[in-house]
Amino acid sequence: MTSDNDMASWNERADRFCKAWSSEVGRPDFDTLSKVYAADPDVVIYDTLPPIEGFRGFEQMRQAIYPQLTYIHVRRTGPIDVKRLADGTVVVTSYPFHLSYGFSDGTGHEIEARISEVWEKRSGEYVIVHEHPSTVYAVAPTGKA
């Protein structure tokens, strides 16, 4: 990876993040992800699926996320936007991605979404201190205007 100010390094970081979330065995690569998320229990992590209140800290997410998950694929589908704040010690990124989930009951989701992440530089490395994906699910028409 090149300089933290180099867009290529942020593209690489986002792609490694997506790869760590992808799995054929139902569990993301939590060892890699534990180095990406700040260890603080007050880090707020939202997801595209419940719980709506999100997770407080990486460990809570790791223990509770998708117990019936059989596979997950995450792929960045567009350019990353990078906004540096606080002399570069805080960076906000966002990018579109495609997400495929499969569950043990045979259901699944194909989602086009955008993720926003707040990264903070700690001990020379950027870690996620807040994450929020957003998407729109297809909703069946209600017949009401």
Positions of predicted regions on the chain:
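Generic short beta-strand segments
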Residues: S94-G102
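Short beta-strand edge/turn micro-motifs at domain boundaries
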Residues: E110-T142
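Short, surface-exposed beta-strand-loop junctions and turns on beta-sheet-rich folds
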Residues: I52, L99-S100, T135
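Short aromatic-enriched loop/helix-cap "lid" or pocket-rim segments at secondary-structure transitions
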Residues: T48, G106, A140-K144
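Short, low-complexity N-terminal intrinsically disordered segments enriched in polar/charged residues
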Residues: M1-A39, T142-A145
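Short S/T/G/P-rich N-terminal loop/turn motif that feeds into the first structured element of a domain
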Residues: M1-A8, L85, S104, K121-S123, ...
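A solvent-exposed, acidic/Ser-Thr-rich amphipathic alpha-helical stretch
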Residues: N11, F30-T89, Y95-P96, E110
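A short, structured loop/turn motif at beta-sheet edges
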Residues: V82-V91, G106-T107, W119-V127
